[in-house]
A protein has these predicted regions:
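Active-site neighborhood of HAD-like aspartate-dependent phosphohydrolases
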Residues: 1-65, 162
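A structural signal for well-ordered alpha-helical scaffolds and beta->alpha junctions
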Residues: 5, 9, 80-83, 108-115, ...
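Short, acidic loop-to-helix structural element flanking the phosphoryl-transfer center
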Residues: 50-97, 107-112
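Short, structured coil segments at secondary-structure junctions
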Residues: 91, 125, 162-164
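Substrate-recognition "cap/lid" segment bordering the active-site pocket of phosphatases
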Residues: 98-147, 154-157
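Short amphipathic alpha-helix with an adjacent loop that forms part of the alpha/beta core around
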Residues: 138-143, 179-189
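Acidic, Mg2+-coordinating phosphoryl-transfer loop and its flanking beta/alpha structural elements
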Residues: 145-182
Length: 190
């Protein structure tokens, strides 16, 4: 969901930068550490990107502190560029959504926020949304056929494929749709 249909990075950068430029930011201890570590009162994608060599620990901690329990944040994230086009293509297959929750410290607001986003933007019921960190466990359907996972992290698609599913590393909507079209015309389509 995040990085495929939803632009989590854009949403979280806007939220963090709004707080860092405020005279009284939420979680000021975390905000001050970000400003001290980066030497500026704003972050960029590289400061929070999961596998970026320039990732900031202070910015990442602030990100979790700000949004892990903010249901409104999760339910109002923007669409990923190309996300609507991708959804228009894949919805014909009646897909489920498989997404990782940000459930740090036992908080579940990201789950309810993501469910709201899915309902409002995709029109799906909660039964069509699955939350899991170990996405590979969903690689094969109950009837033994491989499922398809579209994810923006190879650390998710590779184990999914190794477990018998079809993992598609999402780079952009056009590329993912092309891969799906090839699968549809091959014997590998579920």
């Amino acid at each position: 969901m995040d990085g495929v249909l939803v632009d989590f990075e854009k949403g979280v950068i806007e939220k963090i930068n709004s707080e860092l430029s405020s005279d009284s930011p939420k979680k000021p201890k975390y905000a001050n550490k970000v400003i001290k570590q980066l030497g500026r009162n704003y972050i960029t994608r590289d400061d929070i990107k999961k596998y970026s060599p320039g990732k900031s620990k202070a910015a990442t901690r602030y990100m979790y502190a700000l949004v892990h329990d903010d249901e409104d944040f999760w339910s109002n994230l923007p669409w990923q560029p190309g996300g609507k086009r991708l959804w228009a293509y894949i919805r014909q297959y009646d897909p489920d959504i498989l997404t990782s929750p940000m459930d740090k410290r036992g908080k579940n607001e990201s789950l309810s926020g993501k469910l709201t986003w899915v309902k409002n933007n995709l029109g799906l019921s909660p039964e069509k949304v699955n939350f899991a960190h170990d996405k590979w466990k969903f690689a094969v359907s109950e009837d033994g056929n491989p499922n398809i996972l579209i994810d923006d992290f190879e650390s998710k698609t590779k184990p999914f494929t190794e477990a018998g599913g079809i993992g598609i590393l999402h780079i952009n909507a056009d590329n993912t749709i092309r891969i799906l079209e090839v699968l549809e015309q091959s014997d590998e389509a579920p």
